[in-house]
């Protein structure tokens, strides 16, 4: 039986590879992610990974949000708060990375 393997590689560069807002997550999902009282959750992945620290700073300064998870090695960032606050933080963080650090940006998505 042949199994398909997927290998994810990071290439040198500065980019936001994922920026997704989950509005009104289900209770089970929010609990599994580790943010049980979240009205909204934002998931971002960035390269290089250390950018997650800068993105977390930008997000917290942009709106009343909290950091649920930040990994400077993989570039993963999860923020949470109210829908309006998380959406504003996501918009400001992504645009700030593009404007200040000349990052390549991805499309912002929402569910």
Curated annotation (Swiss-Prot):
Q: Name one GO cellular component term.
A: bacterial microcompartment
Per UniProt, residues of the BMC circularly permuted domain are: 5-103
Q: Show which residues constitute the signal peptide.
A: none
State the compartments where it is located: Bacterial microcompartment
Pathway entry: Amine and polyamine degradation; ethanolamine degradation
Alphabetical UniProt keywords: Bacterial microcompartment
Q: Which GO terms describe its biological process?
A: ethanolamine catabolic process
SUPFAM superfamilies, per the entry = CcmK-like (SSF143414)
Q: Primary place of residence?
A: other
- Output the Gene3D superfamilies linked to this UniProt entry: 3.30.70.1710
Extract the SMART domains matched here: BMC
Q: Which domain of life is it from?
A: Bacteria
Domain note: One side of the hexamer is concave and lined by hydrophobic residues, the other side has a slightly protruding, 6-stranded beta-barrel.
Show the PANTHER family listed in the entry. Answer: BACTERIAL MICROCOMPARTMENT SHELL PROTEIN EUTS, ETHANOLAMINE UTILIZATION PROTEIN EUTS
Q: Sum up the protein's function in the record's words.
A: A component of the bacterial microcompartment (BMC) shell dedicated to ethanolamine degradation. Its unusual hexameric shape may help form the BMC shell. Targets at least 2 proteins (EutC and EutE) to the interior of the BMC. Proteins such as EutS containing circularly permuted BMC domains may play a key role in conferring heterogeneity and flexibility in this BMC.
The record's comment on protein family reads: Belongs to the EutS/PduU family.
Q: What is this protein called?
A: Bacterial microcompartment shell protein EutS
Source organism (scientific name) = Salmonella typhi
